[in-house]
């Protein structure tokens, strides 16, 4: 088999295993545990454990993320080690090297647009790692995230809160000591917050993982907020075609790079909504969008070319909030991964009168929305400008994913 064929097969393996029903093991018969009404678990001081960095978008692209890479060099190498170890399941094949070489070739062909290309180059210089593997890590985050996102309007219609759990790392090496997934634990240690500046002014705030130049969750204070959840079945065929050069010289966007572009180019909810609806994407996704005005909250279900469906605040039974996991709203979730129903029940137990940083954090700290793959929780208030990130840990007994 030719190297490119081997590499594409490995790519399929790495991206499909986390979402593969065949590889999933039934969760124990744990009952959902909504913490609303119990002891107060919200401690804003805990969010200080996730460090803040400033990224100046007026700097040359290669320099923008280098300070973060320097601060987390050891921890990013640990993420590489987990992926490399996982790929040793294929005997006699250096899978990590093959994937890295193929991704580096895609970069050389100009298949990743600037400024993101040069930003990744700058990070690789600091980390002293193979460029192709770092680029693959950026693409890997594009395809494999299991999350819960919530937007909720307060009872007086004055404030909107937006939050998300980032779930990542299922089936990537069980860490016996930590009683968690090895990749999940490694990603907790590279979770960072960033203030993005342009022309000397704060442009927006975001959370991401050190070594990545996109954003996972972001907010432009007093303007709009966004989180993005992956679909349970990624558009892996499109990714394979991209690797083979089928999308060269097009306006195709990577989702998390597009998220950042959105905050650099939009100044309100409506602009963001229109851009999300019109962009051509490499993979489908769920865009959870919040605004500064009453009722500005939507979940846009995207395929690669258009909006399939949109859910809006005040448009249905749970009209004051929207909760989105990794399944289309009109389809039932996989029976061993039903975070939607327990999450909705916990939000209804919270009630609209208790929507706030504390209340939403409590819901997202409730099982099974909190599980062994939960890396961190981000809570934002568009109207108040709050942005807090909390490293999470799911105590046993806990769902594996």
UniProtKB/Swiss-Prot annotation:
Molecular function terms from GO: fatty acid amide hydrolase activity; N-acylsphingosine amidohydrolase activity
Organism from which the protein derives: Caenorhabditis elegans
Catalytic reactions on record: an N-acyl-sphingoid base + H2O = a sphingoid base + a fatty acid; an N-acylsphing-4-enine + H2O = sphing-4-enine + a fatty acid; an N-acyl-15-methylhexadecasphing-4-enine + H2O = 15-methylhexadecasphing-4-enine + a fatty acid
GO biological processes: fatty acid metabolic process; sphingolipid metabolic process
Enzyme Commission number, as recorded: 3.5.1.23
Entry protein name: Probable acid ceramidase
UniProt entry keywords in alphabetical sequence: Glycoprotein, Hydrolase, Lipid metabolism, Signal, Sphingolipid metabolism
GO cellular component, one term: lysosome
Glycosylation sites: 101, 303, 371
Stated role: Catalyzes the hydrolysis of ceramides into sphingoid base and free fatty acid. C.elegans contain specific sphingoid bases, which are unique or different in structure compared to the sphingoid bases found in other animals. Two examples of these distinctive compounds are: 15-methylhexadecasphinganine and 15-methylhexadecasphing-4-enine.
Disulfide bonds, paired cysteine numbers: none
